[in-house]
From Swiss-Prot:
Family named by the database record: Belongs to the universal ribosomal protein uS11 family.
Protein name, UniProt field: Small ribosomal subunit protein uS11
GO annotations of cellular component type: ribonucleoprotein complex; ribosome
Superkingdom as given in the UniProt entry: Bacteria
Function: Located on the platform of the 30S subunit, it bridges several disparate RNA helices of the 16S rRNA. Forms part of the Shine-Dalgarno cleft in the 70S ribosome.
Keywords: Ribonucleoprotein, Ribosomal protein, RNA-binding, rRNA-binding
Pfam families tied to this protein: Ribosomal_S11
GO biological process: translation
Gene: rpsK
Species classification: Bacteria, Bacillati, Bacillota, Bacilli, Lactobacillales
């Protein structure tokens, strides 16, 4: 049988891009794209090995943002616009981690979808 060949990652030279931070109550996903929306790098708290309730911590979001930034910098990325979506606890720490990783943050946009009284929300938790 033929040996499976691994697809070689092509190095793109892209100066600026968009960092999409999706912060839910259970996880934080950081995806870095070029200005047209084509993915360069992504990472999440779960993909880094955090399990269960540890995925939803600000530290896990920070680690996910650092991993995505490091991977995107290999493509020559220097500046990012940040879009944040969701109510999760990892919003602020992910933005700080992107800046600390050496990416210049030019703007921060909150694109959390707000319903115009759509579907009924889940019932209140009683702890």
């Amino acid at each position: 049988m033929a040996k499976p060949t691994r697809k070689r990652r092509v190095k793109k030279n892209i100066e600026s891009g968009i960092a999409h931070i999706h912060a839910t109550f259970n996880n934080t996903i950081v995806m870095i794209t070029d200005v047209h929306g084509n993915a360069l790098a992504w990472s999440s708290a779960g993909a880094l090995g955090f399990k269960g309730s540890r995925k939803s911590t600000p530290f896990a979001a920070q680690m996910a943002a650092e991993a995505a930034a490091k991977s995107a910098q290999e493509h020559g990325l220097k500046t990012v616009e940040v879009t944040v979506k969701g109510p999760g606890s990892g919003r602020e720490s992910a933005i700080r981690a992107l800046a600390a990783a050496g990416l210049e943050v030019t703007s921060i946009r909150d694109v959390t979808p707000v319903p115009h009284n759509g579907a009924r929300p889940p019932k209140r938790r009683r702890v």
